[in-house]
Amino acid sequence: MKALYMVFVLWVLIGCFLSSECQRGFRGQHDPTRPLSPSNPSSHFYPQPDPNRVQISQPDNIPIFMFEQPHSLNICVPPPPLYLGEEFEKLPPNTHIPYILIRPDIEPPSKYIQPVPRKKSNATPAANNFITTATAPNSTDSF
């Protein structure tokens, strides 16, 4: 049963993680709805000059698509379906299951079983029981 709980918890956590990733985008990507920080706006729009004035050129033997920026791709995958076992697959879709036996050797409870009458306990304590709380009249203990 613990394994079923672990599967359920992982299912919920993965679903929450994926839903939050789809709403805010992956880490490190720019959110176009958020304004840019006003600290240094020029660094966002223009490339910084190379202090050594070295131009990096694209080699001729490598295809151009390797140098392109990848597009942001958010993939929303629903959590996997909960698998309950083969015995549930065999049932028709509208089958009502009144109870599920945990152990097959136990009969289901009957509506007509009478409860066992209970005995009243004796309210007076036995003579050898001593009261040792601080509220007892002759208490020698100090708490």
UniProtKB/Swiss-Prot annotation:
Annotated signal sequence is: 1-22
Reading the lineage from the top rank, the first entry is: Eukaryota
Compositional bias of kind Polar residues: 36-45
Tell me the Gene Ontology biological-process terms attached to this UniProt entry: response to toxic substance
Region of interest called Disordered, as start-end residue ranges on this chain = 28-50
Q: Which InterPro entries match?
A: SMR-like (IPR026288)
Subcellular location, principal:
secreted
Keywords of the record, alphabetical order, are: Detoxification, Secreted, Signal
User: What's one GO-annotated cellular component?
Assistant: extracellular region
Q: Where are the transmembrane segments?
A: none
Give the subcellular location.
Secreted
Recorded hits in PANTHER family, A to Z, give: SMR1-RELATED, SUBMAXILLARY GLAND ANDROGEN REGULATED PROTEIN 2 LIKE-RELATED
User: What is the role of the protein in this entry?
Assistant: May play a role in protection or detoxification.
Q: What is this protein called?
A: Submaxillary gland androgen-regulated protein 2, isoform gamma
Q: Which organism is it from?
A: Mus musculus
